[in-house]
Structure formats: structure tokens, C-alpha cells
Curated annotation (Swiss-Prot):
GO MF: asparaginyl-tRNA synthase (glutamine-hydrolyzing) activity; ATP binding; glutaminyl-tRNA synthase (glutamine-hydrolyzing) activity
Lineage: Bacteria, Pseudomonadati, Chlorobiota, Chlorobiia, Chlorobiales
Family membership: Belongs to the GatC family.
Gene that specifies this protein: gatC
Keyword tags: ATP-binding, Ligase, Nucleotide-binding, Protein biosynthesis
Role: Allows the formation of correctly charged Asn-tRNA(Asn) or Gln-tRNA(Gln) through the transamidation of misacylated Asp-tRNA(Asn) or Glu-tRNA(Gln) in organisms which lack either or both of asparaginyl-tRNA or glutaminyl-tRNA synthetases. The reaction takes place in the presence of glutamine and ATP through an activated phospho-Asp-tRNA(Asn) or phospho-Glu-tRNA(Gln).
Catalytic activities: L-glutamyl-tRNA(Gln) + L-glutamine + ATP + H2O = L-glutaminyl-tRNA(Gln) + L-glutamate + ADP + phosphate + H(+); L-aspartyl-tRNA(Asn) + L-glutamine + ATP + H2O = L-asparaginyl-tRNA(Asn) + L-glutamate + ADP + phosphate + 2 H(+)
Protein name as it appears in the record: Aspartyl/glutamyl-tRNA(Asn/Gln) amidotransferase subunit C
């Protein structure tokens, strides 16, 4: 399987991204390198190798939960660039 610049252009259109021709060439090359690596991984014999659920033998290494008072809405919105009706106001991102 090989990724062409046409494939990159199609995927970019779906994601609403714009690439120059040079960027499309580079992206196609990088995606082809990734696919080549995956093909190498698929060729590895893993017969008899037990799957890992984790790479560490340690369990419960997360921090302990500590109860604390959360920020009030006013405190949280104090640093917001824009707010409306006690909510963060952000620019529209979907057409």
C-alpha cells in the first residue's frame, strides 16, 4: 500500500486542512514511511509471546486523591479572554 499526494489532498479536504504541494509531498513521504514501519512490525513473529497489559509490574502508582475546594465560576472566568453568562466564550470554529 502506498500513499499518494492525491490521497493526502483527499484526507486534508476531509479534515478541512490546506497543504501546499511541497507539504503534500512531504506528508505522503512521511505516511509511506509509517506504513512501511507497520509492515515491518506485521512481519515480526510473536508466536508464544504473552501479551502485555502494562509494561510495569507496579500498580496504583497514581497520586492519592486530595479533597480541596474548587475554583468558583468567577475565579475561573477571571482570566478568560471573553465570557458570556458565566461561561467561557470562544470563537466559532465550525462553519
Amino acid at each position: 500500500m502506498s500513499v499518494t499526494t492525491k490521497d493526502v489532498a483527499y484526507i486534508a479536504e476531509l479534515a478541512r486542512l490546506k497543504f501546499t504541494d511541497a507539504e503534500q509531498e512531504k506528508m505522503a513521504s512521511e505516511l509511506n514511511m509509517i506504513l512501511h514501519y507497520i509492515e515491518k512490525l506485521n512481519g515480526i513473529d510473536t508466536e508464544g509471546v504473552e501479551p502485555l497489559s502494562t509494561i510495569h509490574d507496579q500498580i496504583n502508582v497514581l497520586r492519592a486523591d486530595v479533597e480541596h475546594t474548587p475554583l468558583s465560576n468567577d475565579e475561573a472566568l477571571k482570566n478568560a479572554p471573553d465570557s458570556q453568562d458565566r461561561f467561557f466564550k470562544v470563537p466559532k470554529v465550525i462553519g
